[in-house]
Design a protein with these regions (language model features):
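N-terminal, motif-rich segments that launch catalysis or mediate targeting to/interaction with membranes
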Residues: 23-151, 158-288
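Bacterial N-terminal signal peptides
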Residues: 8-16
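Bacterial N-terminal signal peptides that target proteins for export
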Residues: 1-9
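N-terminal signal peptide c-region/cleavage motif recognized by signal peptidases
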Residues: 19-21
């Protein structure tokens, strides 16, 4: 995921509206997904989460704490650059677990994107299995919890689920309103400026939702949610950037004007809400 946080000044310029928090989706979005989940799990699940995260020292990543659910939500990104004493990547094995590049211009098919289980949806299922099994080592259970919290957030960022052979939109240079730095791309817009605007809009997403609403949103399987996020990537993310046709040729730069931004921000917001309530379901199933 894009790791560069945008400044509050940049966000003001981008939106020409009210200021939004200055962290990109990889922090703010993930933390919000985690907070929604924590507000909606069963009391005994909260106890289990706290007990597991109290063992964060087992991860041996003091540079990347995971003692709270908010910290755990960004742990999987934080550890990406960590090296062993001889300079090798400690977590390189997990790089491909954050996404699944499923072509939005072809029929939905997870198989090529999830070869050998190296994709976000397969790892979500794996983490739930590890957490359910009390024979799993304490280290692996803590790590599985941190990965699970993060990966459910990743799955609900549409450009981690859909792709046009462009690295999940990273190759699509994008102007966000009047904010148009040379390196801004479609992925970073959905990670950062758009997510910040969407999440910051009132009312707060972090609250306990009615049981019927939780059940409705969390219905289905991880595979179902994968297809849904892929559909959002096709119908909204790429279509809004390419004049309505998600599979039309990509120009050197695309432009999201204010009307488009206002139309798609609620979609980004809803994906975060879905991610939080679905994470709550998985945590209850795995830990209660």
């Amino acid at each position: 995921m894009i790791r560069k946080s945008l400044t509050a000044l940049g966000i003001l310029a981008a939106t020409a509206l009210t200021a939004a928090p200055a962290t990109a989706y990889w922090e703010y979005g993930h933390e919000t997904v985690a907070q929604i989940a924590y507000a909606n799990v069963a009391p005994r699940t909260k106890v289990a989460i706290r007990r597991l995260l109290a063992q964060q020292a087992l991860l041996d990543t003091p540079e990347c704490p995971a003692g709270t659910i908010e910290q755990a939500s960004v742990w999987a990104d934080c550890v990406k650059p960590l090296k062993t004493a001889d300079g090798k990547s400690r977590f390189g094995f997990a790089y491909s677990w954050h996404y699944q590049n499923v072509d939005v211009c072809a029929p939905f098919d997870l198989t090529p994107a999830c070869k050998d289980g190296d994709c976000v949806s397969a790892q979500i299922d794996r983490d739930v299995t590890l957490l359910r099994d009390r024979r799993t080592s304490p280290h692996d259970r803590v790590q599985a919890l941190a990965f699970l919290i993060h990966f459910v957030g990743d799955l609900h960022q549409p450009l981690h689920a859909g792709d046009r052979h462009d690295k999940g939109g990273n190759d699509v240079k994008t102007d966000y309103g009047i904010y148009a730095p040379a390196r801004l791309n479609l992925h970073s817009v959905w990670d950062g400026t758009l997510a910040e605007r969407a999440i910051s809009a009132p009312p707060s997403l972090v609250r306990r939702y009615p049981a019927a609403e939780r059940a409705r949103i969390a219905a289905g399987t991880v595979a179902d949610w994968s297809r849904e996020s892929w559909q959002v990537a096709h119908d909204v993310t790429y279509a809004s950037a390419l004049g309505g046709d998600a599979c039309s040729p990509v120009p050197p730069r695309v432009k999201l004007d204010e009307a488009t931004i206002a139309r798609i921000a609620p979609v980004s917001r809803e994906e975060v809400r879905k991610g939080g309530l679905r994470l709550a379901k998985l945590l209850d199933n795995a830990l209660s």
